[in-house]
């Protein structure tokens, strides 16, 4: 494009190089071999010149004068200077990183910020305003192709717009790049461009409401509103978008703006409460504080100082490039233009102000408590006022939130840190939800009621991020970019490769999009990073470190993209690394779980939902907390809101975005940030290289290098490069452009692999085009120097020639002047000079007179023509008016037709939506039915559990009552003991009285007493030991008490769970009611759909009426056109008259001798006017004809379209009715299944009850043992008290030894009673152990049953494997039979594989382009319907064929009976049968293989189809494959027919060969003909014929003996005759078809017979030889008859084998059915096993629950024991008091010396026995305790074993389930094979029918052969007679 053309763009200097620059670049010195790029540490790459090359290394001098030495492979060549600042980098000769970098750098230095790189555009941020976006530039780019204009964002936008209009396809523009690269600005420019070129014009202004702008204004003003709340200052960018957006701009059918909508992604909500130092919060906060609108500050109760609010001044508060006050007014006016009400605006401002006040809330820690308390209420009151809340409730919710524990709400205390975190989370949530609400509100405004056809989506999203500290947000952004890059790769490189295929270049398709699939799968697939993160979020005890451990366990060392990072000192710690396409990124996982869960204070959220501020309550209206029930109506796939994590939401949004993008034609824009200092014109090479790698620009170049990036049309190539070798393309003769290019390239010294020839272009590898350019430049330089030399010589010669001519002319002039000077004064010459003027004046006067006359005549004619012209003009005006009226009418009709088309389109869309809704409703109905069944089952289960828990509660209450009774008994015992102590006190008083009397005796017994005291000391030591043992026992008792306390807690927990289950049952009942209501609604909706279909039918009839009206209108228009044509004919006549008159006038003028200049000009004007009128008339007629033709065509098209739509609607109605009936049937099936399930459940419940009864019995026994243990503990306490009392009595009162002995006897009795009780308890324990063993035995029995069932299943699997092996044997058998045609089958296989591969590629293309799927969807549905019809027909045909098969079997039996004795022709049918059977088996194998391929194809299709319904896709794909298989089958049938024809030819040849045994054939044919008429008669005729033949044989044998000499000669004659007979046979076969030919053949045979007669005359002796030969033939005949008998036996054997094969086929089908039934029984058994397993699990859970209950009871008993221990301590205190009294009274014991001596022996004996008993008792108790502990440990072990066993059972069930699935697959395959066998049987039947027809044909041919043989025999007889006559004559003559 020249500079003159570029001037239209206004800013040419910023868009493209000038011509001067281009010329300078071409003349700049450049050496292709020396000018290179070398790597550099600072600048990445620098330009250099090669100095030398040595040993694989290169020494080069850089531009800076620095000499470097690098490896040769690191050196990269520079492009020629003419490629500098090239607009499309894909056209560079050398495509590599430095070339791209320097091309961008040079362009950026000249402020050319836009560059193409193949299919996408690269833009660099200029950091300054450039005049490239004004209205002049917009107008220049409008309607321009990409190649016609310089690179620009407007060019991308206009191309997208033009593609949308021409291709009728949605478009998208993907703008990506890092923060500060200019994404937002380019997005604005794209929207600005569309708003200008596609403005809806006057109509939008008419529709404009006061206070609101036009649609294009609203689209433009949506940006300021979103930027105020979504943009902020960052380190790199003052106006950085902190969210991604996808703006869809919708257009009508004519390309006018219709509406728009916006989707947003990944808002950075953490910025609301935290900013880095060099950054700041969202713009809206600072705009409000700018004090531009003071009323806002008053309304929000804030100041204009940002430092007064904690959330917003953490970084910077002002930005030099942004005026916050002006931006506030822009935001406010944008709200007005977008139609926000004042209430909505104020609500937004209030919530923003409330967030600022949130940051100022202060809390303090309460003293001595971990509880936060408010520190002032001013900010809380302000924020509560702005949010429409109660301040006290808000504070209470912050400090004391309510948490749901079980079924109850509990108030939880919060510390200061927790409260501040909750405030931040609430502020972020409010801001995020407010931003999302704003987006939906803007979308509602941009949604107009105008019809919309297509849209262009603009995606502005953050680019790839690699920071020092990368967290969860970076993972989400990088994952998004990974998906987008994969989409970009697929689109770009698939298009590139499609062009190669289109051009016919040999190219193996490379799917570059899969390069990134490993990383994408690592992030999003199940058990990968995202799913593990979501799983960890569900566990309460999970932490970031457990998340890290799971990641390492699952992926470290298993995935190449997952790596362990290298932590560097001074940098943030990294936990794992991911290898992305842009580089390896280290991620830090701290806080990921919290970020993903994003929890909120639900108490405060509840307040928000009740807020008086309408906007706030709406924002949180749909919020459901962690304790809220899951919404069942949305199906199982939806999780509850508690599990709607950030990662899940992000993936859902990303999947929606990708589906949107896949349905469009994408255009890519890559934005690049040149430097981080925001300096204009400066480019930081390493930064730009990093972005180029991240943006995929270099990736695109890498893939581009694999292909052919440079391509030129053949004509252009020939024109441009013919100069390289003109001799290759001769000048004189015509040569095609392609052939010329081929010849030219082959003549050059170039590697042929570097270029390829397409259909229209020649393709070059990267670098070759630059080489050609260099060669062309060299050639041009040589040619130009030669031309310059020649031109200089030519110019000098021309100059010399001019000098010579000038000299000659000067000589001539000189000669003439000299001559004139000689005659000048001559008198006659003077006279001549005077007379010459007078002669001309007379002639001029005559001419003037004639011209005046002519002028008068012309003037009159002119006046007449003027009047005529005026009349014609008036008529023309009237005609033009009529034409305009007609055009208006046509326009109105076109508008009506367009409206009708739009309505039809809307109807089609409604139909599609209805179908989708019906599918959704059916799916939801199925899901709800499943949920209903599950809920009913859960409800019943919970009811059973409730009843069990109630029983447990009753049992616990009984045990409590018993315990209370025991407690009362112990209290009574304590009272009795206190009374006994009082009695002892009285005894002590009496003893004090006796003390005085005994003092004297005491003095004497002191010595003896000392000895006794020593003994007592030993006793006290033994007592201490016993007490220690007692303490140990008490410790064990305390442990038992703790266990009992735990059991009590578990019991309380169970009670809470019971309440929860009851509540959940209530909820489930409510859900059930809701489901019933939804079912009713669905019925109502179905009725509504039927009504809607009827309405659509009515609408169709209305459209038909309208069509009739339009037809009538068109007929009227045609009549008007006819009238206009007649008028046009009249005008044509007038025009011809005028032209005649004009010609006459012109002739007159010519006769008059010409006219004046005025008349000539008038004539010219009139002619021009007449020509103009003529042209106008012709144009008008052409326009009328064109409009009429267009109207007719449009009418026909509209009629056809409306008819198709009506047919489609009728089909839809029928389909809906079918689906309705199918749904009803499915409902009936579901109800029957439900009844069966209910019955099975009732049986299971009965079994559960029996087991529960047994468990209750065991439980009661366990409780009895517990009670006995409690009794033992109480008795042990009593023993301890008694032991203390005994010791005290021994020490204090020796006088009361007799009483102690009595007490001892009572205690011994009590001990014996205790022993008896212990023995009873041991017995009870033994019984319990027996019961436990029996229960274990039952469990073992159940386990054995389960193992038996598994063994049975294994046996079934063995049977199935045997069946499979049999099938495999059959297959191998068939394969061995089919060896003869393996090559053909392999070819068929290859064809099939190729077709399947093509189908797979088609499926991939379909997956990649969902839009094309949408178009083909209707066609596929029609094909499916046709297939269904074909299937029904084939079923009917199959039934008919079954009937034919039975009839055919009968016919075969009859034919077999008829032709058992004589069928020599069956040999051919046997061969045919063999070949057909082999073909059948081959077809069968091929069909089985095709079925296997079909199955694999189905599975792949299921995986690939995500959004289109699986059913339609599978049917479509199977339909395609079935069509292909039918084609293959037809091909194979054609081959079979060819083989049959070949067999027929073989049969014919066999007939020729059997000419030797004509008599045997004659006999056979006679027998066969007789069987057809009457078997009996033919038998008789055969016998007579045999007798005749025997007579002839006898006569011939008699003559044989005499004629032995001439045998050799007769043999020769016989051979000759056989040849003649063969010729006759051939002629006779032709005689069947044509009678005339038959007669000719008879004549030829007669002539041949005459010849043979002459030969026989010559050789009389040959007759006898012939007779001898005939005898030999008779013998051969006999032999052949024997062979025929053998062949019949073989045929019978083959028939039997065929029947056996059929029988085996039937048996295999029966086996398949048996296997199917076994499979169903296995499935039922599996269901039973699952039910048993679930029952066992429930039982185990109940046992565990009972153990917990028992533990709780034990804990309760321990508490009671603790109380009793306290009472014991009190008693011990009293005993200590008594001991003190004893010490005081020891002095009084002297008097009791004598009694002490007596009592000494008794005391010693009794004490020892008592001690021995106590020790024995202690040992028994210890043994019992150890046994009890052992039992407890065993029970724990048993529990663990049972748990392990349960896990094993679950694993086994899972394996069984998998095996069953495999069995199901096998059964399905077998069923498919059975169907294939059925089809093959049908095909065999068809083949049998064809064989039967062939047999009849052969039979007919045999009849004809019989006739021919009869004729031949008669002729032979004649010959014999003649020969005999001749022989007789010869004998007579002799």
UniProtKB/Swiss-Prot annotation:
Muscle myosin is a hexameric protein that consists of 2 heavy chain subunits (MHC), 2 alkali light chain subunits (MLC) and 2 regulatory light chain subunits (MLC-2). Interacts with ECPAS. Interacts (via C-terminus) with LRRC39. Residues 1922-1934 have a biased composition (Basic and acidic residues). GO terms for molecular function: actin filament binding; ATP binding; calmodulin binding; microfilament motor activity. Residues 84-777 form the Myosin motor domain. One of its GO terms (cellular component) is myofibril. This is Myosin-7. It comes from the Eukaryota. The modification N6,N6,N6-trimethyllysine is found at residue 128. Limited proteolysis of myosin heavy chain produces 1 light meromyosin (LMM) and 1 heavy meromyosin (HMM). HMM can be further cleaved into 2 globular subfragments (S1) and 1 rod-shaped subfragment (S2). The rodlike tail sequence is highly repetitive, showing cycles of a 28-residue repeat pattern composed of 4 heptapeptides, characteristic for alpha-helical coiled coils. Four skip residues (Skip1: Thr-1187, Skip2: Glu-1384, Skip3: Glu-1581 and Skip4: Gly-1806) introduce discontinuities in the coiled-coil heptad repeats. Residues 780-809 form the IQ domain. CDD domains: MYSc_Myh7 (cd14917). It is found in: Cytoplasm, Myofibril; Cytoplasm, Myofibril, Sarcomere. Keywords: Actin-binding, ATP-binding, Calmodulin-binding, Coiled coil, Cytoplasm, Methylation, Motor protein, Muscle protein, Myosin, Nucleotide-binding, Phosphoprotein, Thick filament. The cardiac alpha isoform is a 'fast' ATPase myosin, while the beta isoform is a 'slow' ATPase. InterPro entries: Kinesin_motor_dom_sf, Myosin_head_motor_dom-like, Myosin_N, Myosin_S1_N, Myosin_tail, P-loop_NTPase, XRCC4-like_C. Belongs to the TRAFAC class myosin-kinesin ATPase superfamily. Myosin family. Residues 31-80 form the Myosin N-terminal SH3-like domain. ATP binds at residues 177-184. The modification Phosphoserine is found at residues 1136, 1268, 1509. The modification Phosphothreonine is found at residues 377, 1281, 1308, 1512. Residues 654-676, 756-770 are annotated as: Actin-binding. Gene3D superfamilies: 1.10.10.820, 1.20.5.340, 1.20.5.370, 1.20.5.4820, 1.20.58.530, 6.10.250.2420, Kinesin motor domain (3.40.850.10), Myosin S1 fragment, N-terminal (2.30.30.360). Residues 839-1934 form a coiled coil. The modification Phosphotyrosine is found at residue 1307.
